[in-house]
UniProtKB/Swiss-Prot annotation:
Organism: Mus musculus (Mouse)
Top-level taxonomy: Eukaryota, Metazoa, Chordata, Craniata, Vertebrata
GO terms, biological process: adaptive immune response; natural killer cell mediated cytotoxicity; negative regulation of natural killer cell mediated cytotoxicity; positive regulation of natural killer cell mediated cytotoxicity; regulation of natural killer cell activation
Keywords: Adaptive immunity, Cytoplasm, Immunity, Innate immunity, SH2 domain
Residues annotated as domain SH2: 5-101
Keyword Nucleus found: no
InterPro entries: EAT2_SH2, SH2, SH2_dom_sf
Protein name from the UniProt record: SH2 domain-containing protein 1B2
Amino acid sequence: MDLPYYHGCLTKRECEALLLKGGVDGNFLIRDSESVPGALCLCVSFKKLVYNYRIFREKNGYYRIETEPSTPKTIFPNLEELISKFKTPGQGMVVHLSNPIMRSGFCPGARRLNLEANVYENTDEEYVDVLP
């Protein structure tokens, strides 16, 4: 999966600089989480602040996002559908997503995202021990 607004291992500070440039509400990008291994962050600008929403990949390969507690939990088959939902106002984010910030050039983390797409298939939890 090669999303043009996925920036890989962009730091939180670098992310804030990109999103706040121009002062437009609804700028967004996806980056790797610095504090939760394997998680992604959907980062969006609103009123000169950057809000971060963690995205987790479920065992079945679907994606789940942390939003306001009052918002029903929804899972998505891919990141494109997740982003599409939150482009609509009133979906549980501080502001709807309106302007993707595209990465410029090579993104070292993009290949990692592709490799992790099927990690859930390689866990020990789904295997049965065979007795001799």
